[in-house]
């Protein structure tokens, strides 16, 4: 029932009267509110538009306005803006280009608000109060400001200018009037509200369709609608569209680079399309968008009436275009529309290409090639009419969805204002007044402060003094537009040259950062009071203009740190201290704050800020000074530079807090100390009189990783103590000029830092990684590694910065720290695939073409054949005693219940059918069949998991760091070269030929069965799921009571399988050339080869370890995919192939939807990928000694040792979904490690006699007509048994009684029942060898 119908259901007159009375009260309140914000009468056409945007109006109002609807939109956005302004009227707001009378729409009284207006056009002096009009742009001294319907006339430079002149300004709100349809020069989308007039370089916005109150816009003003961020020098401003109503928009601007949407949309009343340009010259085509509904109607008309004439088309256009809309089309537009649809009517719409339904297998294979040749022919000779029609119908959707822009304003460019106001505002806006706030007692001859400060602590948190004075704004001299600032011989830092030369800098040239801004070697200067102290160190500090000043610690910060120490949430040594010591520390932090002398030395890394202090200590070793360091690495560096001092002079920060000896302390790199530590130390050090802090506020701060700590909520130390720094040395000796300038630092160091980009991890570099977990794992794999933040104090000639999914989470200071470590070379190693347009590629990737390579086959180079050594004489034959076969079978048959007690049951499909025949022995083997529907659905439920491409992508990104660890472990295990392996096209095509040859070697019926997956209409990422038909013969599954889920087979698009099968085979060939001898992969190897390897490499005196995984295929998630990506990139596989593989794994489609990331049988590289992931995981998890024999095949592995788990890997175990099933063998008779159904024994690689006997019994009990009966499999089983059979008496050295019995029964079955020739020939050869050896 609709809401309107509810009232009709009420029949009681009194109840209806009550409802109407309540409605009347609401209407009165609404009309009262509407009278305040929208009192005007709205024309009927405009009312629907207002209702669409939820703007109320009074239908009975008689008050008129020339553009009432447009005015309603303006006021509505004012009210919306008031929600983002301070809620209390006592907090001032600056209103720019706004009349004071409009404050009522913001619900403000205005007694504390400020107005900034300009005299731009003649009427401004009449509408703005004189005391609010400025001839220049003054500083905004409030935190919030508002610009009303004016910002759209200015460029982005004006916005930068407002923020750069107003350091206190935090939020700027602005309303703008810009119709988005003007991008396409369309008619007004809301003609009842406004109309548009277009000219060559400008357009007019006419509210209400009337002249007199119009806005004139340049077309570039529309760029405000796509504004995202703007960067100018050190200032970045982010804008967000808060609300849009028709052509009126409310934007909010803030400092900093914040998150913005990629796209911004605007309302489109109906879908519009832009017709393609089918005539030349281009001007004789339809230029403006038209409604898509009309375009489709006109198309269907001209195709339905037969031979359409020009008159027919004219008549249809006249019939379907409403009288009110005829004026929207110009005569030439109508002519072009008529000719366009006449052309569509004359073109043939019958498909000119061949259909494929009746194709034979041969035609189906060659059809794509024929179609491609036809397409090329038509491009050269001309298209058919059907192709012309399809091209003429490629209309462009006009949806008013635009990509949000990031832009940078040009360096030294004046604010581009409109020409009619440019001359008026040029003096006030394009010239910035230069001033600096001074504080405290002057230092005498201290050089003048620099205005180029760019330090976090140098804003509004400076200590105040009674002598502070307010500086009035003075208009600066006029600057001419579009002229470069003249270069002067005198430098802004000339007064500081003495200090700079003392640090080793000539500072005689200008250097610029990447944005073109001048880099000053001295920043953030302050005038602070001097407080002399009785120590010889004072003269040194005075000489370098670093005199100390008085300081009292913030005890709240000290107490916060003490609470975390007591709770064991910070520190390592402090956690172990007794409760009494912690209580004492907490008590001291609550005492009256001590007053000490404090000197803060700020400077870039390598600037020499600590040089004067170290020189003083070197020349005055008798002066007791204690140096406190945040890390052991930094402590070792100080000890190396000052070897004459006692080692206790240099202490880590925790030891110093435990034993604060002396009165003078230096804290180096103090920003790396825990927040609140310095204050707590001051309170805890009884004799402390002078504290010197050195550090770089641009580098990483300390961050406590323990959960629920309090100190991370405190302000960084650089913010607290930065106000006590007299200047910042923004120059370095460490980094050459190109790297330093890129970081915004001055440098005179010769040479250049080479910056490289790679996708492969190089060795021989100091690795910088974003996380502690990754650092520990890199270190455990023999890589020298530090975190981005933890590398502070390290200087290395060559640095490799590992970029992964954690890198974007790092702060600017952390990245600055990492980038400033190198002196000669920086390698940026990206371990992530390119994700910029991943989802677009998923949607837009075309079908992979099924094309056979009809080129000459190139045979892959194989290993040289080795000559077989001479055979040893066969041992004498031995007759085994006859055993009872029933004893072997009883253990399997006796515990088995009835069939239906073992089968899987489903309410919809009934029982499965895996337990077959009445033979109790055959019932011990589960027979899984593809036609078993119950088993199929049980298998799908257990083996497959549905997901979405977005969830898969999230999974992939989340587990990338795990994949990096796997790749490093695999690379180390397989002894791959450090540099990427150059791609070999000849080997690639040879592998492709092998894959193709293998596929074509299938019988014809198998090729016909796959015809659906060979068709180009089968999606490249689609797959069909089948249940594998098989007898379950794994030794641990034989005789299992409950029926288990089966195995799935995934059938992909055949060209997809061949492409990635080629990739896997190519990497296999490369792998074989580097694979160490102690590792064997059971691929393309026979029993004889493996036995020979076992004899040469396996030590049976050591314990052995084997492992299998539970649900191995389903467990290969995003971590394994990242590992495969890195492996493929290291093999230099073409990027388009790697990206296609990632897209396939993240967006594999089946009947249930998208599959989660997992391994699928039949996807191409299944075996190779399974094996290599097994190797990577095993070597990442365990410490495997060098030269230990190892065997791998898929998810099976065998190691000739008892591996020890890496401690660094323990936190990662739960992050993997892999679940191991390890076994340890002592290697003795009857207990040998099993690998792929065989036993690794001192006599070679032999078939497990128990499994062989069980399988033979199953084959013997089948009917001769059934597949897999004894006559079908006897020869194959005999070949498996032959190596064991040939050992003779040596079997007693390896088999126990149970295994010997099983071996005897197998031999007896094959010779007496199957009459196999293999064992009879072997027996004859043994007898001949025995005869000849006796002679």
Curated annotation (Swiss-Prot):
Q: Where is the composition biased (Low complexity)?
A: 453-466
Q: Does the keyword Protein biosynthesis apply?
A: no
Output the InterPro entries linked to this UniProt entry: (+)RNA_virus_helicase_core_dom (IPR027351), Alphavirus-like_MT_dom (IPR002588), DNA/RNA_pol_sf (IPR043502), P-loop_NTPase (IPR027417), RNA-dep_RNA_pol_alsuvir (IPR001788), RNA-dir_pol_PSvirus (IPR007094)
Q: A single GO BP annotation from the record?
A: DNA-templated transcription
Q: Where is the Alphavirus-like MT domain?
A: 58-225
Coiled coil (UniProt feature): none
Query: Can you tell me which residues bind ATP?
Result: 603-610
Enumerate the UniProt keywords alphabetically: ATP-binding, Helicase, Hydrolase, Multifunctional enzyme, Nucleotide-binding, Nucleotidyltransferase, RNA-directed RNA polymerase, Transferase, Viral RNA replication
Molecular functions (GO terms): ATP binding; ATP hydrolysis activity; mRNA methyltransferase activity; RNA binding; RNA helicase activity; RNA-directed RNA polymerase activity
Q: What does this protein do?
A: RNA replication. The central part of this protein possibly functions as an ATP-binding helicase.
Family (UniProt): Belongs to the potexviruses/carlaviruses RNA replication protein family.
Q: What is this protein called?
A: RNA replication protein
For the (+)RNA virus helicase ATP-binding domain, which residue ranges apply?
564-729
What does the record give as the reaction this protein catalyses? RNA(n) + a ribonucleoside 5'-triphosphate = RNA(n+1) + diphosphate; ATP + H2O = ADP + phosphate + H(+)
The annotated region (Disordered) lies at 428-492
Xref: Pfam families: RdRP_2, Viral_helicase1, Vmethyltransf
Write down the EC number.
2.7.7.48, 3.6.4.13
Q: Where is the RdRp catalytic domain?
A: 1102-1209
Ranked from the top, the taxonomy reads: Viruses, Riboviria, Orthornavirae, Kitrinoviricota, Alsuviricetes
- The (+)RNA virus helicase C-terminal domain covers 730-863
**Superkingdom per UniProt:** Viruses
């Amino acid at each position: 029932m609709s809401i309107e119908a509810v009232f009709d259901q009420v029949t009681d007159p009194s109840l209806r009267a009550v409802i109407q009375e309540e409605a009347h009260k609401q209407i009165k309140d609404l009309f009262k509110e509407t009278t305040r914000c929208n009192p005007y009468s709205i024309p009927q056409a405009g009312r629907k538009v207002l209702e669409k945007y939820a703007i109320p109006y009074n239908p009975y109002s008689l008050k008129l306005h020339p553009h009432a609807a447009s005015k309603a939109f303006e006021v509505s956005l004012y009210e919306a803006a008031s929600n983002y302004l301070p809620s209390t009227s006592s907090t001032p707001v600056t209103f720019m280009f706004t009349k004071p009378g409009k404050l009522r729409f913001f619900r403000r009284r205005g007694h504390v608000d400020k107005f900034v207006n300009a005299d731009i056009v003649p009427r401004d002096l009449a509408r703005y109060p004189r005391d609010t009009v400025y001839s220049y742009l003054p500083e905004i001294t409030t935190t919030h400001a508002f610009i009303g319907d004016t910002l759209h006339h200015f460029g982005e430079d004006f916005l930068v200018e407002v923020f750069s002149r107003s350091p206190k300004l935090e939020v700027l709100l602005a309303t703008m009037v810009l119709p988005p349809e003007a991008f396409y020069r369309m008619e007004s989308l809301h003609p009842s509200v406004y109309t548009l007039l277009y000219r060559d370089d400008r357009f007019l916005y006419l509210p209400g369709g009337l002249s007199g109150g119009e806005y004139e816009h340049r077309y570039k003003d529309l760029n405000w609608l796509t504004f995202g961020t703007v960067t100018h020098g050190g200032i970045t401003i982010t804008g967000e569209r808060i609300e849009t109503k028709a052509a009126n928009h409310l934007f909010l601007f803030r400092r900093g680079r914040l998150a913005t949407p990629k796209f911004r949309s605007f309302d489109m009343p109906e879908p519009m399309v832009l017709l393609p340009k089918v005539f030349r010259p281009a001007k004789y085509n339809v230029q403006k968008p038209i409604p898509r509904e009309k375009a489709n109607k006109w198309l269907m008309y001209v195709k339905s009436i037969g031979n359409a004439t020009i008159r027919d088309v004219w008549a249809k256009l006249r019939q379907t275009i409403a009288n009110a809309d005829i004026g929207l089309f110009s005569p030439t537009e109508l002519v072009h529309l008529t000719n366009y649809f006449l052309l569509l009517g004359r073109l043939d719409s019958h498909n000119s290409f061949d259909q494929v339904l009746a194709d034979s297998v041969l035609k189906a294979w060659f059809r794509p090639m024929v179609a491609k040749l036809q397409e090329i022919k038509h491009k050269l000779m001309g298209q058919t009419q059907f192709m012309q029609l399809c091209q003429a119908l490629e209309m462009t959707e006009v949806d008013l969805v635009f990509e949000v822009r990031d832009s940078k304003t040009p360096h030294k460019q004046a604010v581009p204002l409109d020409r009619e106001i440019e001359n008026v505002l040029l003096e006030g806006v394009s010239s910035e007044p230069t001033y600096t706030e001074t504080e405290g007692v002057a230092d005498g001859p201290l050089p003048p402060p620099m205005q180029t400060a760019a330090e976090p602590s140098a804003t509004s948190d400076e200590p105040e003094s009674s002598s502070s004075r307010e500086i009035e704004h003075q208009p600066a001299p006029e600057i001419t537009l579009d002229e470069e600032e003249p270069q002067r011989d005198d430098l802004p830092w000339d007064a500081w040259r003495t200090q700079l030369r003392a640090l080793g800098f000539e500072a005689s040239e200008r250097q610029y950062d990447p944005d073109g801004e001048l880099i000053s070697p001295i920043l953030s200067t302050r005038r602070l009071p001097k407080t002399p102290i009785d120590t010889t160190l004072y003269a040194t500090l005075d000489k370098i203009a670093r005199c100390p000043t008085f300081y009292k610690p913030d005890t709240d910060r000290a107490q916060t740190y003490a609470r975390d120490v007591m709770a064991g949430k910070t520190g390592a040594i402090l956690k172990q201290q007794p409760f009494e010591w912690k209580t004492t520390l907490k008590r001291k932090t609550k005492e009256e704050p001590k007053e000490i002398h404090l000197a803060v030395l700020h400077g870039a890394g390598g600037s020499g800020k600590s040089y004067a202090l170290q020189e003083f200590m070197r020349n005055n070793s008798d002066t007791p000074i204690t140096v406190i360091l945040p890390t052991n690495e930094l402590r070792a560096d100080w000890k190396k530079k000052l070897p004459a001092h006692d080692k206790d002079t240099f202490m880590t920060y925790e030891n110093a807090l435990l034993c604060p000896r002396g009165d003078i302390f230096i804290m180096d790199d103090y920003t790396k100390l825990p927040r609140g530590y310095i204050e707590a130390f001051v309170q805890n050090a009884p004799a402390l009189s002078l504290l010197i802090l050195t550090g770089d506020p641009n580098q990483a701060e300390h961050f406590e990783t323990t959960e629920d700590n309090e100190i991370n909520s405190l302000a960084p130390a650089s913010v607290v103590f930065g106000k006590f720094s007299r200047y910042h040395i923004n120059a370095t000796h460490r980094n050459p000029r190109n790297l330093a300038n890129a970081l915004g630092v001055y440098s005179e160091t010769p040479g250049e830092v080479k910056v490289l980009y790679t996708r492969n991890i190089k060795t021989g570099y100091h690795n910088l990684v974003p996380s502690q977990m990754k650092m520990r794992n890199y270190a455990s794999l023999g890589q020298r590694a530090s975190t981005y933040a933890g590398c502070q104090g390290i200087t290395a000639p060559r640095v490799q910065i590992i970029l992964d999914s954690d890198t974007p989470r790092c702060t600017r200071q952390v990245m600055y720290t990492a980038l400033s470590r190198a002196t000669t070379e920086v390698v940026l190693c990206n371990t992530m695939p390119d994700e910029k347009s991943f989802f677009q590629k998923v949607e837009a990737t075309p079908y992979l073409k099924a094309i056979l390579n009809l080129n000459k086959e190139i045979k892959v180079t194989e290993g040289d054949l080795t000559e077989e050594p001479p055979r040893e004489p066969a041992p004498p034959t031995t007759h085994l005693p006859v055993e009872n076969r029933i004893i072997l079978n009883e253990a399997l048959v006796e515990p088995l219940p009835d069939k239906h007690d073992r089968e899987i049951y489903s309410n919809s499909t009934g029982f499965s059918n895996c337990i077959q025949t009445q033979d109790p022995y055959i019932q011990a083997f589960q027979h899984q069949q593809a036609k078993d529907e119950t088993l199929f659905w049980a298998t799908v439920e257990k083996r497959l998991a549905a997901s979405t491409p977005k969830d898969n992508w999230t999974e992939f990104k989340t587990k990338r760091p795990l994949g990096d660890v796997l790749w490093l472990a695999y690379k180390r295990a397989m002894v791959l070269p450090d540099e990427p392996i150059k791609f070999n096209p000849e080997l690639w095509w040879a592998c492709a030929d092998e894959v193709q040859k293998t596929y074509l070697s299938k019988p014809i019926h198998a090729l016909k069965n796959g015809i659906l997956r060979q068709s180009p209409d089968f999606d490249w990422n689609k797959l069909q799921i089948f249940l594998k038909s098989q007898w379950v013969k794994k030794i641990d599954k034989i005789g299992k009571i409950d029926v288990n889920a089966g195995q799935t087979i995934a059938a992909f698009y055949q060209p997809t399988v061949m492409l990635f099968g080629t990739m896997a085979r190519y990497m296999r060939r490369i792998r074989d050339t580097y694979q160490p001898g102690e590792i064997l992969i059971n691929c393309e190897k026979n029993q004889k080869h493996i036995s020979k390897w076992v004899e040469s490499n396996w030590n049976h005196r050591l314990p052995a370890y084997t492992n299998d995984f539970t649900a191995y295929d389903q467990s290969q998630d995003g971590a394994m995919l990242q590992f495969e990506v890195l492996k493929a990139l290291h093999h230099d596989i073409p990027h388009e192939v790697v990206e296609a593989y990632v897209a396939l794994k993240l967006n594999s489609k089946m009947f249930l939807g998208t599959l989660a990331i997992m391994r699928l049988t039949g996807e191409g590289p299944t075996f190779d990928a399974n094996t290599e992931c097994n190797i990577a995981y095993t070597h990442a998890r365990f410490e495997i000694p060098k030269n230990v024999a190892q065997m791998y095949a898929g998810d099976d592995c065998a190691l000739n040792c008892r591996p020890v788990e890496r401690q660094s890997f323990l936190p990662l175990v739960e992050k993997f979904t892999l679940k191991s099933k390890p076994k340890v063998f002592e290697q003795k008779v009857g207990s040998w490690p099993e690998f792929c159904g065989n036993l690794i024994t001192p006599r070679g690689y032999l078939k497990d006699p128990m499994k062989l006997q069980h399988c033979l019994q199953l084959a013997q009990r089948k009917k001769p007509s059934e597949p897999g009966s004894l006559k079908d499999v006897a020869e194959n089983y005999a070949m498996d048994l032959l190596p064991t059979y040939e050992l003779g008496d040596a079997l007693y050295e390896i088999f126990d009684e149970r295994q010997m019995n099983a071996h005897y029964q197998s031999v007896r079955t094959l010779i007496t029942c199957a009459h196999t020739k293999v064992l009879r020939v072997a027996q004859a050869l043994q007898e001949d060898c025995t005869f000849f050896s006796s002679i």
